[in-house]
Amino acid sequence: MKYEEIVADLKAGKYAPIYFLSGEESYFLDDIATRIEKNALTEDEKAFNQTILYGNDVSMTTVTDTARRFPMMSQRQVVIVKEAQNIRDFENLLPYIDHLQPTTILVFLYKNKKPDKRKGIFKKLSSSSHCIYFESAKLYDNKIPDWIISYCKDKKYMISLKAAGILAESLGNDLSKVANE
């Protein structure tokens, strides 16, 4: 699925049970995760139903146990796993995929590293109808000005192609840096 399609679904309030977001361009991964984090639950629901975990600190068993909980006074809960590339026992997610908790939105941020698609878990994630499997590649330098124009248009600003080219040239291809400017 493409970034634009995922964002359109999120804006429409359509959430998948699992999001596996990987790749070298962290801007797209962070943006999708932030949209889920900010919009899937109301402020009141977040206290009990939103959990952010870090791959360095947890095992997959902890992640799946958290995802299997039922939401409290809400329709759903959100579990976001940052630095998921550091989880060693990723294979332990397989039983959860087969028996999902339908009220949970589970988000994995697998940054700056490509998953080994030969492993069973990543094959299962990429082929599962319950999972949005998104891989973001770095944008080529010649695509950055067009991305800047599109980004500005989304934010209701106007920018010329020449100005976008100058911005791209001075800031490079780090989209997070470009978006902050």
Predicted regions and their residues:
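Conserved beta/loop motifs at nucleotide-recognition and modification sites
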Residues: 1-181
